[in-house]
C-alpha cells in the first residue's frame, strides 16, 4: 500500500487478517507487525495504527490511499470495526481525510454501506464477479465498478467467467458519465492493461502482481 501510494498509484490496505486472530495466529502476528501494532491490541486499534503508518509514510509523496474491506455477512463484524477506525481517524484529522479518501468494498452486497460512504464523502469502489452485483452497485451509488474475472486472487465468483468476457459486458451495461469501470484478475503487465483500455475500461486493479 505504501509503495503503491508513493509511486503515484492508489495504495490499498487489506483489512481481513484480523479475522485470523484465533484461527491463524501466524498470519495475524505478521499483520500486526506490518501495521506497527501489538497482538494484544483490539481490532479497531490495529486498524488505526495501520492506517496511521500508511499516512505517515506517504506524507512526502502526498500519496492517496484507501482501505479494501470484505463486507459479506460472514465478516460483517470485522467490516464494522474497519469502518469505525476509518470514521474516527478521518474526523480527527483534515489531512488524513484528504488523503485517506477511498473505500473499496468487496465480497458482499454494497447496499448496506451506502449511507456510511455518503456520510464520509469517500470515493467508493466495489469489487464483484457478475452483472447482478454490478446492478446493485449502481443502485447503491458506487462510483467505480471493479469487475473481477475468474483469474483474480481471492476471487468470489461461483462461475468461471474470465476477465476478457466479464469486463466488456460490464462496460457496455453500466459505464456512464457518473460511473467508472475497472477490471481486475489477470492484469499484470503493460499488454494486459492496454487490453483493458482497448475494451473501454477506465483502469485496472492489481494485487498479486506486486508480490510476484
Protein language model regions, located:
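Active-site entrance/lid segments in N-terminal catalytic domains of soluble metabolic enzymes
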Residues: 1-177
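Gly/Ser/Thr-rich loops at beta-strand to alpha-helix junctions
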Residues: 110, 187-188
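Conserved active-site-proximal phosphate/metal-binding subdomains
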Residues: 155-180, 188-212
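Short hydrophobic "strand-cap" motifs at the C-terminus of beta-strands
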Residues: 184
